[in-house]
């Protein structure tokens, strides 16, 4: 389990531009659990209606899997799809009412020329027999999964009123091999684990990846200089910048919401404290000054304050301090161990690794109604490193199963968990990236 201090041996790092890399071994993905109260929706297969080569991506399968793993929806199994309309005029609503479906998605894929495809799809309210959404998107073959995720986002938002977060990316660290032959990699993949690509390879562990708010860079910890150092790396080009290599600990980087500052934990004065660095001038502002260990900073959504882990009260708990410094206030009071906070986009929810004895689970404190209420999101015994999706509908975290590291993405109501497992080795240190924008 990750404790407030977790600094490892020196690194030898190979830096790799994203565009120049072959994809590494991917993650095996499966969905665990479900909920009878999830909204029923039929996502009908979308056939290819063209004369050329059909795309390899099964658009409807990707859309359905996205909706399933959100915990908000339950898609109709393929064996129960008794009719296969491809457009609204072909939908027999009584059929889907009989099958007790609230919504139905239909569509088709067509040849758009020059190696591109056009996807047209529609969303209907089954009870009312009314169309809620009708859109068309065009993309090349290698972007069809992106299109599918964007379709799922639009459907999710139209029904729930909440922006979808399927077309996003996650970062994580993999570890494979044994003993002196261990190898590590900082990876970026789609939010469902597909399309993994390597950002950094290393002969020693890598730590604490953190996304810039525009999704273009990652901050992370490296030991290649003989001491922990913090780097910023451009995901597309592989270009990187050393931003912190003070004597002692340089750890736990966290981008501010405007991307102009970096919160970090430094022990340059002897004890680990929370600092903020202006990334333009590289000027440091020390926020905490306490004999306890202060680490794992993460920003409040408005950029006005920073949450962090501290054992100043005797055991690790979450505290909050103004981004300009000052006195810190304790935030968590339930349990003897709360660490590695992740804060939702609206600041109302905080996910933490919560410990009791030798058991560590992911818990969430919800302040939406004023007084904080707690819920447990994970069932494991060694769960850590929670990271909210940008819409706070899911939480990504690391777990130990059978002596190896895996990732889970759990819906924020704990209805559904998606497991992401490396076929040969461990996966750890997850970080959910920001919303993406189409160019």
Swiss-Prot record:
Its main location: periplasm. Keywords: Cell cycle, Cell division, Periplasm, Signal. GO terms for biological process: cell division; protein import. InterPro entries: 6-blade_b-propeller_TolB-like, PD40, Tol-Pal_TolB, TolB_N. The keyword Signal applies. It is found in: Periplasm. Residues 1-22 form the signal peptide. One of its GO terms (cellular component) is periplasmic space. It comes from the Bacteria. Part of the Tol-Pal system, which plays a role in outer membrane invagination during cell division and is important for maintaining outer membrane integrity. Belongs to the TolB family. The Tol-Pal system is composed of five core proteins: the inner membrane proteins TolA, TolQ and TolR, the periplasmic protein TolB and the outer membrane protein Pal. They form a network linking the inner and outer membranes and the peptidoglycan layer. This is Tol-Pal system protein TolB. It comes from Xanthomonas oryzae pv. oryzae (strain KACC10331 / KXO85). The lineage of its organism: Bacteria, Pseudomonadati, Pseudomonadota, Gammaproteobacteria, Lysobacterales.
